[in-house]
A protein has these predicted regions:
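Conserved Rossmann-fold NAD(P)-dependent oxidoreductase catalytic core, especially the SDR/UDP-sugar
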Residues: 249, 253-258, 264-272, 276-331, ...
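NAD(P)-dependent short-chain dehydrogenase/reductase
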Residues: 313-315, 345-423, 428-433, 437
Length: 614
């Protein structure tokens, strides 16, 4: 078991969370360790616990009834405690709980966690939000021209990220956004061997390159963008006093999109990026809002719908955040939840006007799967599966090398997941439509909006789509046995074959994504996207979007091998033309075209080697 972490007070989970006795309902005055807040800390501690979780998982797979599995487990636990009492009595032991813990891994939960509640009453909170919305409406009226059209000036953090790039693309074609200032750090280019500084790319240089990669090439398209130096982990976002003074008199909105989306980051790194970065952005926006004569309307915080953690099939509501009964999958989710609490505090105590926008798991855009070169999150396992299939299909080397490559590829095609587990995947273009809609709707101030879907996709459907599109035979492994038995064995084998990178990759895929492909996933409530933001009631077809992700990663990115962003941008422009042609020919979305027909179309119209249209 890992040693307790010695954290500085400003990083302590106790700032946000209370540990409460189930016996007395009193708050336990003891330090909460970050690892105690993750699901990994509370499972696999006993061989019987492993077997019980495996039994529940298989029962869900067989029946599709999660409530039945929980009821069966409650009965088994009750029998285990009763058996421990009998054994303790027969052997003269005084503490049956020690017996149950030693023999069966059973333990009564003695405490629970909850978020610290703000002292304001519900009525006071609602009144505060109504006041902030009214202020926002008045500020938005000031931002309109004589014809009543909004003239919005937006500052964006995280513009070089996956979602940030889509914000730039859509903003470029939005006439109501007349200026967008993008915070971007200078980039140092160093010699790989010596570490010597070769050159530094300024924010303006990086911005020009970024706009080119987004196909924004004309002076008209580029004229609304300005790139300035900044760093969200620094006070005042690292913006110079001169720039900040100018922004105070011009900006109507701040979109804080910068974050760490690494699911395997340690607590301290996740906290610094997600909580400290959010606090810096909130203080920055408060300074804009409080400036005399400021045109500032609202701050938009981009969070995640997974701030609700492992709720186990309970609906995660948009209007509240509670500590999840079954903890968090990782520190990314936990620290984003902490950042959401800080955001609420700034609204209630400091009067900052904020809209909280919470995307689910964001994937490539809905028409063509375009992901702007991203290779993380859902793209990572798809790329692994694709490369594994190629290794099986076209083995190189002598008999030994071919055998080893085949074995490695088959290992890579084992994925932990229950067939019925549901993932909430949402295309990036839908997410950004929601973000830019929120910019124009002051009524969204004080609201938390899930930019998620009501047509979730199951692990089984993902497996089938990958098989159809990539030809990969994915084996869904029972998550608990995979985590506790299969993965350690595979890691030993791979280490013996001198393949530590593959072993590490498999371990990462299992630990990072396994939590999202287990049964008992939360259901993220949706509705504010339509009611508050005015988005269409019909959300994107998730299966079509995931199918396009697979196709895009196969043809455009070559499963992550194409890393040059300029080349990816060129390919994605060709790809977009292809998808428009396909949709015109088929009369429907490209994602609805069968795998066989899609491949035939690509072979007809695309020279795959040079990636140009035939």
């Amino acid at each position: 078991m890992a040693e307790p972490q010695d954290l500085p007070p400003e990083l302590s989970p106790n700032r946000y969370i209370e540990k409460v006795s189930l016996v007395t309902n009193e708050v336990l005055e003891e330090e909460i360790e970050p690892r105690q807040l993750l699901v990994h800390h509370h499972r696999d501690y006993h061989v019987v616990d492993v077997q019980a979780r495996t039994f529940m998982s298989r029962l869900v797979d067989a029946t599709g009834d999660e409530d039945l599995a929980r009821e069966k487990m409650r009965k088994i636990r009750a029998r285990g405690f009763k058996a421990a009492e009998v054994i303790a009595k027969a052997t003269g032991l005084k503490d049956p709980e020690k017996v149950s813990r030693a023999l069966f891994g059973l333990k009564e939960r003695e405490y629970y966690f909850r978020y610290k509640k703000h002292p304001a009453s519900r009525e006071a909170i609602d009144a505060r939000y109504a006041e902030l919305r009214q202020q926002g409406e008045e500020q938005m009226a000031r931002a309109r021209d004589e014809a009543g059209r909004p003239r919005l000036r937006v500052l964006l953090t995280g513009g070089t990220g996956f979602v940030g790039k889509e914000i730039l693309w859509q903003a470029a074609h939005d006439p109501e956004i007349v200026e967008m200032v993008v915070l971007i750090r200078p980039k140092e280019i160093r010699d790989r061997k010596t570490g010597e500084l070769l050159e530094t790319h300024s924010p303006a240089q990086r911005g020009e390159s970024l706009l080119g990669q987004l196909w924004l090439e004309t002076p008209e398209e580029r004229s609304k963008f300005r790139f300035i130096a900044g760093d969200v982990e620094q006070p005042q976002l690292g913006v110079s006093d001169e720039d900040y003074a100018e922004l105070q008199s011009s900006m109507t909105h701040v979109i804080h999109c910068a974050a760490s989306v690494a699911f395997d980051d340690p607590y301290e790194r996740s906290f610094q990026a997600n909580v400290t970065g959010t606090l810096n952005a909130l203080r920055f926006s408060l300074g804009l809002q409080q400036h005399e004569g400021s045109p500032f309307v609202a701050h938009l915080g981009i969070e995640t719908s997974y701030i609700h953690g492992r709720q186990v099939r309970k609906v995660a509501r948009e209007d509240e955040i509670v500590f999840p009964r079954n903890f968090y999958n990782n520190f990314y989710e936990l620290t984003k939840a902490m950042a959401s609490l800080e955001t609420e505090r700034f609204m209630l105590e400091k009067g900052l006007r904020v809209v909280q926008l919470c995307p689910a798991i964001v994937i490539g855009e809905s028409q063509g799967g375009n992901n702007r070169g991203d290779t993380k999150v859902v793209n990572a396992p798809v790329n692994v599966f694709g490369r594994a299939h190629e290794a099986l299909r076209d083995p190189d080397g002598d008999w030994f090398e071919r055998t080893r490559a085949s074995m490695l590829a088959r290992m890579a095609c084992i994925f932990p997941g229950n067939p019925s587990a549901e993932l909430n995947l949402i295309p990036v273009d839908w997410v950004v439509k929601g973000i830019l809609s929120a910019v124009k709707r002051p009524r969204a101030i004080g609201e938390r909006v899930h930019l998620a879907t009501d047509n979730r996709v199951t692990s089984e459907q993902i497996r089938d789509i990958v098989q159809e599109e990539l030809g990969v035979d994915i084996k869904l492994a029972e998550p608990t046995l995979h985590r506790t038995v299969t993965l350690p064995v595979l890691s030993k084998i791979l280490t013996g074959l001198k393949q530590p990178r593959i072993a590490n990759a498999l371990e990462k895929l299992g630990s990072i994504f396994g939590g999202y492909s287990e049964w008992g996933q939360p259901i993220h409530e949706v509705g504010n996207d339509v009611r508050v933001l005015g988005l269409p009631e019909k959300r994107p077809n998730t299966q079509h979007a995931f199918r396009m992700l697979c196709r895009h990663n196969r043809y455009v990115q070559d499963f992550g091998r194409i890393r040059d962003l300029d080349e990816i941008a060129r390919r994605e422009k060709v790809w977009a033309q292809l998808m428009e042609e396909l949709e015109e020919r088929s009369g429907g979305p490209a994602g609805a075209v069968s795998a066989a027909d899609f491949r035939a179309f690509i072979n007809e119209r695309l020279d795959a080697d040079s990636f140009v249209l035939r």
